[in-house]
């Protein structure tokens, strides 16, 4: 996973649900990013048992509350190095990425601030709650791989 750029890792962090129109992806999520992320996506699907159908449901705005989906979201964070030594989400890369995209900056900062406060539970529950919250507050910047 070391070959991934910070931009890729950041987009993957953001990529835990829907875009503006359900089922579409943000313009900055390229086909190349999706291709590079595929090995991690496949590994996390295998590890957690989440189905492609469940992932697609989230992309379409249907939030299923199954444990496999919740743990899949945390697995993505973990595999892309977005979890610190306390096994908590590290948002520095995400914030740095969006500093270069002024159209999204304030929206992203607000969503992160609000969602970090309300997310809780174990790692899987935290990832799911944060992702769902973020998707609701910044749908333009979010997509689930």
Ranges and model annotations:
Residues 3-22:
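Cleavable N-terminal signal peptides of Sec/SRP-targeted secreted and luminal proteins
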Residues 19-145:
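Mature extracellular/luminal domains of secreted and GPI-anchored eukaryotic proteins, especially small
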